[in-house]
Design a protein with these regions (language model features):
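Short amphipathic alpha-helix that is part of the acyltransferase structural core
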Residues: 28-69, 99-100, 185
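Active-site/acyl-donor-binding loops of N-acyltransferases
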Residues: 1-23, 79-81, 87-90, 95, ...
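Generic surface-pattern signal
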Residues: 56, 60, 78, 82-85
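Short, catalytically relevant binding-site loops at active-site mouths
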Residues: 43, 73, 109
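Beta-rich nucleic-acid/ligand-interaction surfaces
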Residues: 67-82
Length: 185
């Protein structure tokens, strides 16, 4: 219907599922000076201020990135804090303590009050290898918390994360196509 109305494919994405028992293999190669830690659950506003600053830098070259103010960013994310599980919020920090990457995971609340899946929702990094360390840490934490599966959500088909998800044995269960159309005038 949309294509017949002049819309064309702009980008393709997918979501995939992987049993967590299959992702807890060998630790990724060490990345000099990076440590991955879980969020301690304190000061969520400070957490999101750091995430905002890193996100701006890590995302600025993404095709659909549109800058927003820190105030707007905080207004968007602070309401979800009560739904967050601190053990699924991870940070990669350099030896000087500065933030090199972050990962947000959430329980799959669509499965009801006792979800069996955790969703690797968003991650961004500024250092090579940080994303891989964060994903590994997420899988370990989710497995430790009793989740059976991880969902790698909304991954661009041509992103490094797509290759990593496939290498971990994830099976695609949903595909998405972003359509667009140039408007006249």
């Amino acid at each position: 219907v949309f294509r017949s109305a002049g819309f064309a494919e702009i980008s393709r994405y997918f979501s995939a599922r992987v049993p967590l028992k299959e992702t807890t293999g060998p630790t990724p190669p060490e990345t000099d000076g990076l440590d991955v830690d879980e969020w301690d659950g304190s000061d969520p506003e400070a957490l999101f201020r750091q995430v905002f600053a890193l996100s701006r830098r890590a995302s600025r070259n993404n095709a659909f990135y549109k800058p927003i103010s820190e105030v707007a960013f905080l207004a968007r994310y602070m309401p979800v804090v009560p739904m967050m599980k601190r053990e699924l919020i991870l940070f990669a920090r350099r030896s000087d303590g500065s933030l090199a990457g972050f990962l947000f995971g959430i329980p799959n609340y669509a499965e009801g009050p006792n979800p069996k899946s955790a969703i690797l929702k968003t991650y961004a990094s500024l250092e090579p290898g940080a994303g891989r360390l964060l994903a590994y840490g997420f899988h370990k934490a989710a497995f430790r918390l009793g989740y059976e599966n991880a969902i790698h959500a909304l991954i661009h088909d041509n992103n490094t994360s797509a290759n990593r998800s496939a290498a971990e044995g994830a099976t695609i269960f949903r595909r998405y196509t972003l359509l667009g159309r140039k408007l006249n005038g």
